[in-house]
């Protein structure tokens, strides 16, 4: 089904470090009154506040015209006679986790006085590795073992014949992933392998971090920076200058993943029909006074609480009353409270199943644990409460939390533009619900937002910026958007933004779902945008409205000639939604379009589409 435009069917800060490098001490530029005032203020701050304030001062210093005459500049001049040794940090990130770890590493390196540069993998030229002495790569893994979109080019370069010998390079790799997937931390493992093959030396063992990565990543960063300081000093490549506390880098916002903003739920409205098999909610959250800003393509992180009833059900399965206490981050909590607010109690994982098989003695689970594929399939389709139901087992409170991962926030693609909604943020949330042995099962975050959180209630949120899913800078550039189901969310943001910017570029949307009458999300809005001309074209695919199922990839192929023409006209392509099937099918459809309409062999068509990704003209936000 297709719709065209306008139609619709004070001391010397270095006096204790004089032995480090033999540099002259850096004199304090503060008078006694300034220094005493600073000391009094600093003494009242927490460590988190100190980190923020130090970065704030550093940011101010960087923008002062007289910065060249500051003690930092003097310190730099004192070591400039020697070759500049530095640490280069490269992040390969899809959703922002690896970027966050890399930014934390950068801040910590600066606080240690280490010269450091931070690069998005898409902005780093692989050949420059031959000029580096110390590199740390922070890499997440996308989909089924694929490199994140921003790292595809670097990942391919290191496998190519053009990759240089790296015998002078020392490196470290921190890999992020989810052990529920077969190719756990694959991208990080790849980078480790490729660098070693090119002759580089690892100065610290690679760490493979699971979804609750924060503590492990923090410890690894500490150890890695210690080794970097040792090797930089021993190699005499550069002297480590211990900078004043004010030189630590600033965080981008007062509110972040570790320090979320307590916002208010304004609206939770079901936008699927009463006879739909889905419950999809339009969520509006008030950010007034937070100072939080976002761009189209960004995500909102939501810290949610688990169902109290589910926590009680789990406790009953393992013989606990709920009043037993556990220690979580130095805080003593009842086990029931801990399950509600601190631990993941919905989604299972292979490690949990294997450990419970051992504790319970369940023959069924022990047999599953011997087959990785079957174990992975079972854990993906069985919630924790149902794993524990396999065999009644008495656990202590500490044994129970030893099986569980820490609770992590859920990221949702933002469905609004601040140019349109100001200090609000909108989401499109599909409630995850299904039956298991005649029992209703729900997703943790989606049921919190759609069922348990009432309008006017508090929700802790933060903005996760996504530089890998951004509108073209040139407003005349055409865009093609493919977003079935809740994958429509960022494109609502895109269209709102393009309308408010009076962007002249054409906009083409492919949307799909089950039925036209029950599942056409934001239907009235798309009608309005078609009528006004903001939306140039809309093609929809409702899979259950006819005998033969039709999906968005079929609509792309039906319009192959026009899609190819838009690509030739410079269009950017965006895909959002399911990674397991939809994204792959859409990718294959685009390759077929290039093959047929571009009159090129299949291999060349594949390369053409991959080149679009490298040029950031083909961007994906898939999950």
Swiss-Prot record:
Name of the molecule in the record: Sulfite reductase [NADPH] flavoprotein alpha-component
Binding-site list for NADP(+): 543-544, 549-553, 585
Highest taxon in the source lineage: Bacteria
InterPro entries assigned: CysJ (IPR010199), CysJ-like_FAD-binding (IPR003097), CysJ_Proteobact (IPR029758), FAD-bd_FR_type (IPR017927), Flavdoxin-like (IPR001094), Flavodoxin/NO_synth (IPR008254), Flavoprot_Pyr_Nucl_cyt_Rdtase (IPR001709), Flavoprotein-like_sf (IPR029039)
GO MF term (any one): flavin adenine dinucleotide binding
Domain FAD-binding FR-type intervals: 258-472
Pathway the protein acts in: Sulfur metabolism; hydrogen sulfide biosynthesis; hydrogen sulfide from sulfite (NADPH route): step 1/1
Membership in a protein family: Belongs to the NADPH-dependent sulphite reductase flavoprotein subunit CysJ family.
Coiled coil, from the record: none
Pfam families with a match to the protein in the record: FAD_binding_1, Flavodoxin_1, NAD_binding_1
Record: residues binding FMN: 93-98, 140-143, 176-185
GO biological process, one term: cysteine biosynthetic process
Region (Disordered): 1-32
Gene3D superfamilies assigned: 3.40.50.360, NADPH-cytochrome p450 Reductase, Chain A, domain 3, Nucleotide-binding domain of ferredoxin-NADP reductase (FNR) module, Translation factors
Catalytic activity from the UniProt record: hydrogen sulfide + 3 NADP(+) + 3 H2O = sulfite + 3 NADPH + 4 H(+)
A GO cellular component entry from the record: cytosol
Positions contributing to FAD binding: 346, 380, 410-413, 428-430, 434, 443-446, 623
Gene name for this UniProt entry: cysJ
Segments forming domain Flavodoxin-like: 87-225
Purpose of the protein: Component of the sulfite reductase complex that catalyzes the 6-electron reduction of sulfite to sulfide. This is one of several activities required for the biosynthesis of L-cysteine from sulfate. The flavoprotein component catalyzes the electron flow from NADPH -> FAD -> FMN to the hemoprotein component.
Complexes and interactors: Alpha(8)-beta(8). The alpha component is a flavoprotein, the beta component is a hemoprotein.
Cofactor note: Binds 1 FAD per subunit. Binds 1 FMN per subunit.
Cofactor(s) the protein requires to work: FAD; FMN
EC numbers on record: 1.8.1.2
Keywords: Amino-acid biosynthesis, Cysteine biosynthesis, Electron transport, FAD, Flavoprotein, FMN, NADP, Oxidoreductase, Transport
Natural source organism: Vibrio parahaemolyticus serotype O3:K6 (strain RIMD 2210633)
